[in-house]
Amino acid sequence: MSEKTIAVKAQKVDEVADMFSNSVSAVVADVRGLTVAQADDLRAQLRDEGVSLKVIKNKILTRAAEKAGYQELNDLFKGPSAIAFSKEDVVAPARILKKFSGTADALELKGGVIDRKVADLDTINRYAALPSKETLLQQLLAEFQSPLRSFMYAVKAVAEKREADGETAETPAQETASDDSKSTKAEASDASTTENK
């Protein structure tokens, strides 16, 4: 093997090790049997959510995983291995690959890295069942809005009841101003009476 070839392979190992180090999740899958059209479709779905799919030789994967501190992954690198890397979304690679495997029997998840920790297939499958980040944010927003909406309805109901009962809803500031006005008038009246005496 020439020095140039060794240097190229070392550079490739460094690149893949950086992918592992810079990703919050990386899911390993067996892609044997996927058609070109299926592979293109899968790549497009992953790319839409900021996930990159790489098919890498097992020797390079093994060295790169060791360099990144994920040597426990080495048992997964048998047969043609593809890895879906995500730098931001912990759930997306597992969710998209799992969903795609439902329509493409040839795709098989093996394991990977979730939140920078080595994860077995059961863990990958649990994460795959979670909704997308956008859906989670929408659900969280709905949870926050629900109590606020209930409070607003309650305030409105109280106001409507007061109106129906013929009450005037004075604000505390108005009540205080009214009390101050009465108090000032009373003091002026007392002063006037004292002067007349």
From Swiss-Prot:
Which terms in the GO cellular component ontology are assigned?
A: ribonucleoprotein complex; ribosome
Query: Which spans does this entry mark as compositional bias, Basic and acidic residues?
Result: 179-188
Under InterPro entries, the record lists:
Ribosomal_uL10 (IPR001790), Ribosomal_uL10-like_sf (IPR043141), Ribosomal_uL10_bac (IPR022973), Ribosomal_uL10_bac_type (IPR047865)
- What is the scientific name of the source organism? Oenococcus oeni (strain ATCC BAA-331 / PSU-1)
Q: Which protein family is it in?
A: Belongs to the universal ribosomal protein uL10 family.
Tell me the protein's name. Large ribosomal subunit protein uL10
Q: Name any Gene Ontology BP term.
A: translation
Domain of life (superkingdom) = Bacteria
One GO molecular-function entry: large ribosomal subunit rRNA binding
Has UniProt tagged this entry with the keyword RNA-binding? yes
Q: Which gene encodes it?
A: rplJ
Identify the Pfam families for this entry: Ribosomal_L10
Question: Which residue stretches belong to region Disordered?
Answer: 162-197
Record function comment = Forms part of the ribosomal stalk, playing a central role in the interaction of the ribosome with GTP-bound translation factors.
Q: What is the lineage of its organism?
A: Bacteria, Bacillati, Bacillota, Bacilli, Lactobacillales
Q: Which SUPFAM superfamilies match?
A: Ribosomal protein L10-like
